[in-house]
């Protein structure tokens, strides 16, 4: 069985949602506190020297990291969780899958730990990065239609990102006021019976 090393509510939530949608069994291993010295960090370091979550230990003992790579792995088993090959939605799915981790993810690295990157002006860095993140979400919102999911009636793995990331900064109210498509998609995903246990355990709902 796959082991998902993560922290409730963090990026590992996205992987949990993907695996749950795909009916792939897994065991969650809580490594809360991994971002500081201690037992959790030492455990995670033995699997992933970069000490990032999610880190997945697969059935064959190989290690998988990076949520976009995990999504591609899931699609090998459940291709129906992406738009069909040959449709325009497929290209947008591929683009947004990479865009999210290449553009939005780094803003959390800098805004969550600003003192690491700008020790002389951490609050200014945090403020600037959060404003930049908002501009990214506004662009992303313009690419989506929420009918009811990111690519229409078909639920895809990109929806797992939107559902989870809405709970991170700048928060639910901001999305409701400024990124209504993202907010509506997240609401639709949060209503899926299949995901209730994972969503509650990760305090998404």
From Swiss-Prot:
Which residues belong to any copy of the GST C-terminal domain? 86-205
Is Cell cycle among the key words of this record?
A: no
**What residue stretches are annotated with the GST N-terminal domain?**
1-82
Q: Which CDD domains match?
A: GST_N_Beta
Q: Which GO terms describe its cellular component?
A: cytoplasm
Identify the residues that bind glutathione.
53, 66-67
Output the superkingdom of the source species: Bacteria
Q: Is Transferase included in the keywords of this UniProt record?
A: yes
Q: Which UniProt keywords apply?
A: Transferase
Similarity section? Belongs to the GST superfamily. Beta family.
Protein name (Swiss-Prot/TrEMBL)? Uncharacterized GST-like protein YncG
